[in-house]
Amino acid sequence: MTGFDRARIEAAVAEILAAVGEDPSRPGLSATPSRVADAYAEFFAGLGRDAEAELGEPVPLEQGQAETVILREISFRSVCEHHLLPFIGVAHVAYLPGEAVIGLGRIPRVIDTLAARPQVQERLTEQIADTFEAGAGARGVLVVLSAEHGCVTARGPRQVAATTVTLAARGEFAEPAARAELIALIGCGAA
């Protein structure tokens, strides 16, 4: 990650603690600025990284084109750029390979890279779909994310059971019939 300034983050966290009326040097809080900096280094590790590079080198198919590949229930976490609170959920990715396939382990790497930056779920969904369409040469892509947002569950409306579902479809999977079939296969309940 480029541009990560640990000292500034620690100073800013200490200032926030002081601004809410706490003593950042008291026992229990004295290490908090360092802990938050550690967490932010992890949360934002995708900044400056190329998600498409995470796809690796596609493996050419020996006999033309393959059928649909679906990887379901991929856990992810990101940080909402509006409140800097986490959103945590699962991703489902379906793609229709062109002349090559990508390693299944590469799919979560792409998601992790794109999620590890200040995000909104809607954009994250689109970025994942765009990465597979462009970087993997997929003829069709469908991405469904379902997540619980800290800004909905822990503050404001405090709806602890609320989930947000977003969907992005590209290529052949943008067709309504193909999209509906994949959603049924994924079994995630998205409309």
Swiss-Prot record:
Keywords: GTP-binding, Hydrolase, Metal-binding, Nucleotide-binding, One-carbon metabolism, Zinc
InterPro entries in the record: GTP-CH-I_C/QueF (IPR043133), GTP-CH-I_N (IPR043134), GTP_CycHdrlase_I (IPR001474), GTP_CycHdrlase_I_CS (IPR018234), GTP_CycHdrlase_I_dom (IPR020602)
Pfam family, one: GTP_cyclohydroI
UniProt entry tagged with the keyword NADP: no
An annotated GO cellular component: cytoplasm
Record EC number: 3.5.4.16
Catalytic activity: GTP + H2O = 7,8-dihydroneopterin 3'-triphosphate + formate + H(+)
GO biological process: one-carbon metabolic process; tetrahydrobiopterin biosynthetic process; tetrahydrofolate biosynthetic process
Domain of life: Bacteria
Gene3D superfamilies according to UniProt: 1.10.286.10, 3.30.1130.10
Binding-site residues, Zn(2+): C80, H83, C151
GO molecular function: GTP binding; GTP cyclohydrolase I activity; zinc ion binding
Keyword Hydrolase in record: yes
Pathway, per record: Cofactor biosynthesis; 7,8-dihydroneopterin triphosphate biosynthesis; 7,8-dihydroneopterin triphosphate from GTP: step 1/1
Summary of subunit composition and partner proteins: Toroid-shaped homodecamer, composed of two pentamers of five dimers.
PANTHER family tied to this protein: GTP CYCLOHYDROLASE 1, GTP CYCLOHYDROLASE I
NCBIfam families: PRK09347.1-2 (NF006825), PRK09347.1-3 (NF006826)
Family to which this protein belongs: Belongs to the GTP cyclohydrolase I family.
The protein's name: GTP cyclohydrolase 1
Protein source organism: Leifsonia xyli subsp. xyli (strain CTCB07)
Name of encoding gene: folE
